[in-house]
Amino acid sequence: MALFGSSGIRGVIGSGMTPELALKAGKALGLLHKKIVIGHDPRTSSHMIEDAMVAGMLCSGARVTRIGLVSTPTLAYAARNYDCGIMITASHNPPEYNGIKFWNPDGMAFSLKQQDELERLIESDIRGVGWEYIGSESHASNAILDHIDVILRNVEKCSLKVVVDCGCGAATTITPYVLREMGCKVISLNAQPDGFFPARDPEPIDENLSELKEAVKAFDADLGIAHDGDADRMMAVDDQGRLVTGDELLAYFCRFEVKDSVVCPVDASMVVDRCKPGVKVYRTRIGDAFVSEEVRKVNADFGGETSGTWIFPRISYCPDGIYAAAKLVELVSKNGRLSKAIADLPRYPLKRGGMKFSHGNKADIMGGIRAEIEQANSRINTLDGVRVEYPEGWVLIRPSGTEPKIRITAEAVDEGAAEKLYSQAESIVKRCIDSCAQ
């Protein structure tokens, strides 16, 4: 059974994620690395999972440093002084979930090769070292201050009014402090860590951010910032109290922060291709780890996913919602109202949907879709599903990772063209589903 998903090992406490699994993971990791730093988010199960993980690492003779309640980007930045870093978190998932994220010293998540090696060891029978070789444990308290320091060295002072919704997550330890040190007037919401996430669901999407949107208007703030449970994500609300979409925020960063090149996944809007002439756009599979890998490979200025993960390689290859918040505030201070800057971006109608199936499998269906599309089109990207480029727009057809469904996304220069591209893709998907069901 595959343990690793797109963001480490994750599951519901008591079933997909247990202390027993964390103990095995710790023993396996301790065989591969001997100097390890570990931190956690505020979930009710985080101490339990961390303790089990640490016990396993000590059992294999590792030297472990605990840095306590921190954000994921804080942990990933701290990992630069260790063989690797471990974050106990389930990020944007509901409170009953928890997980283990693995980070290299440069802020890159563990590669597929590293994951495979670790998974093989987890599934083996590791006895551990003798009593005289058991590892050691220590505590460090400077990780948050170090992260704050590197952020402040890479942004300029400004005096905006900012509302920050920490969501009762790990951002409570850092984002309000960073923005105040920058010179901002900060109004904090849900700034007490609470693993039950009583104020809102940890995922920073529109329906979960009503309080933030109202607060931005009520306090006449320049913008609002929202994080998920471990603060690797950052989303924003403009000065009118409207959530800035992930595609808009990606394009905003591209327009004002990127000089030469940007990396984004295949499902990102074509606005990123057209918002700043001369910028090279590289597209990857969906998932921040793939974006980070490509940022490093092509030496890009910036990478981002529309879910709210933003990668600034000058700091780290780990998505850093804290630095993203600070950088966004700096850019708004320099370039004027966020609502106007977003309104000035190109706009293209985008339609998302999909078709479920009860017979056949995703691989066969996608194989049929790819074969049919390849017969009629030459501009095809098959990194993640099938993306087809047209003069007026593009279509992406890809399998869902969680349900028997083929997802369809179409974007074009006008509504009619988007509807036409979507309908054409939908017809192809239906034919291939029907064919595989026979």
From Swiss-Prot:
Transmembrane parts of this sequence: none
Cofactor(s) annotated in UniProt: Mg(2+)
Keyword Phosphoprotein: yes
Catalytic reaction annotation: alpha-D-glucosamine 1-phosphate = D-glucosamine 6-phosphate
Post-translational modification: Activated by phosphorylation.
A biological-process GO annotation: carbohydrate metabolic process
Keyword Magnesium part of the UniProt annotation: yes
Residues annotated as catalytic: S91
Molecular function via GO: magnesium ion binding; phosphoglucosamine mutase activity
Key words of the record: Isomerase, Magnesium, Metal-binding, Phosphoprotein
Residues that bind Mg(2+): S91, D228, D230, D232
Residues modified to Phosphoserine: S91
Cofactor mode of binding and number, as noted: Binds 1 Mg(2+) ion per subunit.
EC nos: 5.4.2.10
Function, as annotated: Catalyzes the conversion of glucosamine-6-phosphate to glucosamine-1-phosphate.
NCBIfam families, per the entry: Arch_GlmM
Family: Belongs to the phosphohexose mutase family.
HAMAP family, sorted: GlmM_A
Name this polypeptide is given: Probable phosphoglucosamine mutase
Species this chain originates from: Methanocella arvoryzae (strain DSM 22066 / NBRC 105507 / MRE50)
Lineage per the UniProt record: Archaea, Methanobacteriati, Methanobacteriota, Stenosarchaea group, Methanomicrobia
